């Protein structure tokens, strides 16, 4: 998703007559469904709320004796990408902020001093959190973060897509 525009695609199923796309709004706790006929009709576009988590389920179906017979669903959680911003920074602390995402269970915050490796979970935050204060930063000036929204669904934790951001620590020289 991007700015509320949801673009879905999936692999075609060889013996399918079509697909059912079910989109569950995790904030409103309501679902909507649409049937797409045709084996190769494996893309769907729609507008959704930008700061809301969704559970998307795609089922292939086949007509048997005048009834749709569905496959097992394929679930994925999606949301608008989070943008992280530096609210305040000093030589040893940094406060990172993001826009609230509705319909999730919480956030995992990971940090590293390298963009490619060494990420460790720094914090687990509640669903209402919109910022985190990071202490004991290194002197390199670069700290890389990613904030991963998650949702508990049927007893299992599912994580959402995320981006890695580089934040700079502000230094004061006397």
Predicted regions and their residues:
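Pro/Thr/Ser/Gly-rich low-complexity, intrinsically disordered linker/stalk tracts
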Residues: 1-15, 67-103, 139, 155-174
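Residue-level signal for short segments within beta-strands and strand-turn junctions
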Residues: 12, 23-27, 60-64, 111-115, ...
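Short S/T/G- and acidic-enriched coil/turn segments that sit immediately N-terminal to beta-strands
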Residues: 39-44, 128-133
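Beta-strand-rich modules
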Residues: 45-68, 134-155
């Amino acid at each position: 998703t991007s700015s509320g525009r949801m673009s879905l695609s999936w692999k075609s199923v060889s013996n399918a007559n079509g697909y059912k796309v079910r989109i569950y709004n995790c904030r409103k706790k309501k679902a909507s469904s649409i049937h797409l006929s045709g084996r190769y009709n494996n893309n769907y576009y729609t507008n959704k709320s930008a700061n809301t988590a969704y559970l998307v389920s795609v089922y292939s179906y086949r007509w048997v004796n005048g009834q749709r017979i569905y496959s097992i669903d394929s679930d994925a959680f999606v949301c608008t990408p989070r943008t992280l911003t530096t609210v305040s920074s000093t030589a040893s602390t940094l406060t990172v902020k993001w826009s609230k995402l509705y319909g999730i269970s919480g956030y995992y915050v990971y940090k590293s001093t390298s963009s490619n490796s060494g990420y460790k979970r720094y914090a687990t935050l509640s669903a209402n959190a919109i910022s985190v204060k990071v202490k004991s930063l290194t002197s390199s000036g670069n700290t890389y973060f990613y904030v991963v929204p998650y949702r508990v669904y049927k007893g299992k934790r599912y994580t959402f897509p995320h981006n890695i951001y580089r934040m700079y620590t502000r230094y004061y020289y006397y």
